[in-house]
């Protein structure tokens, strides 16, 4: 994917999607100095244009993935979100999550993802980094049954209150095996021409890696990150990590928090669906990414420091992920 001039309506574009990624997130203070001109504040946006969310079930999954395969060439920027039944394993009460090292965070993540089932995957597609999403798909999976599978009750109640019909998932949902096969053959994964945008993405990618592998997650964090790189490439942008870079560089503390808070701070409105549904959140993630990139990463190459970094699982250059807690 060629690079383009950045600024104004054009926006940034990943400069070398095919190049070997070298983590550089720890160097961002060298890229954002006190002399750098402050970006304009967020401005109110007009109501977003309505976007249809395409619901994907077992009876139409083949047809919908044909549309996905056809869309990738025109819309190679993909925002992704997942829904799953919460978390059931936590750090000891005396240990705050923020004090865990990346490896300890991954061990906790692995224990949850290995034990639980994916419920929904949302995918939103855009033509360029500055374009609104053109297509959105919500893939509904069938494996999870709250009557027999472990889950966090509060999380499942929240999903139900947000319109997720778990009975319909069990009756009409796509099997994880079928989803994995279609995802592998779709051109979405193992494709260096696709760029991925997420928000606080460690669990999202972990569930997709588990589904694609068809088994439990790798034992160690570096091996897991290698699988993420193989399946999803180097052009992976976690908006929560971007927000932390912007906060550290510009003092924008309003950008710290969950997706709804960050979107609100940027005055980005939800364009489709309801919160806590995967496709709607993937669309909101993309629109939040667009506005954050416009305001805080306007120069060509300025987002390179964020590429390939999953929030909370950051590995410093030459580090071993066992000694440094995440910020």
What are these regions (language model features)?
Residues 1-115, 126-182, 239:
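N-terminal accessory regions of nucleic-acid-interacting proteins
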Residues 3, 92, 115-121, 126-322, ...:
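Metal-dependent phosphoesterase core characteristic of DEDDh/y 3'-5' exonuclease domains
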């Amino acid at each position: 994917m060629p690079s383009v001039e950045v600024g104004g309506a054009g926006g940034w574009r990943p400069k070398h999607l095919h190049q070997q990624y070298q983590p550089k997130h720890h160097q961002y203070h060298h890229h954002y100095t006190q002399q750098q001109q402050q970006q304009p504040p967020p401005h109110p946006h007009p109501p977003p244009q309505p976007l249809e969310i395409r619901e994907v079930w077992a009876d139409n999954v083949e047809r919908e993935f044909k549309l996905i395969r056809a869309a990738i060439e025109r819309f190679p920027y993909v925002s992704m979100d997942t829904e799953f039944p919460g978390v059931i394993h936590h750090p000891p009460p005396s240990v705050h999550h923020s004090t865990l090292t990346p490896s300890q965070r991954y061990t906790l993540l692995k224990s949850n993802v290995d034990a639980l089932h994916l419920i929904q995957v949302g995918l939103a597609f855009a033509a360029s980094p500055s374009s609104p999403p053109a297509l959105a798909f919500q893939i509904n999976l069938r494996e999870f049954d709250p009557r027999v599978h472990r889950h966090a009750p509060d999380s499942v109640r929240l999903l139900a209150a947000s319109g997720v019909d778990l009975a319909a998932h069990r009756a009409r949902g796509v099997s994880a095996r079928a989803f994995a096969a279609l995802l592998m053959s779709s051109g979405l994964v193992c494709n260096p021409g696709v760029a991925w945008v997420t928000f606080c993405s460690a669990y999202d990618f972990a569930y997709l890696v588990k589904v694609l592998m068809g088994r439990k997650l790798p034992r160690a964090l570096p091996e897991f990150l290698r699988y993420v790189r193989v399946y999803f490439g180097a052009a992976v942008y976690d908006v929560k990590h971007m927000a932390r870079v912007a906060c550290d560089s510009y003092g924008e503390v309003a950008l710290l928090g969950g997706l709804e808070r960050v979107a609100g701070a940027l005055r980005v409105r939800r364009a489709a669906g309801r919160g806590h549904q995967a496709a709607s959140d993937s669309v909101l993630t993309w629109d939040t990414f667009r506005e954050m990139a416009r305001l805080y990463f306007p120069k060509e190459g300025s987002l390179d420091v964020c590429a390939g970094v999953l929030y909370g699982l950051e590995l410093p250059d030459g580090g071993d992920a066992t000694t440094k807690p995440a910020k």
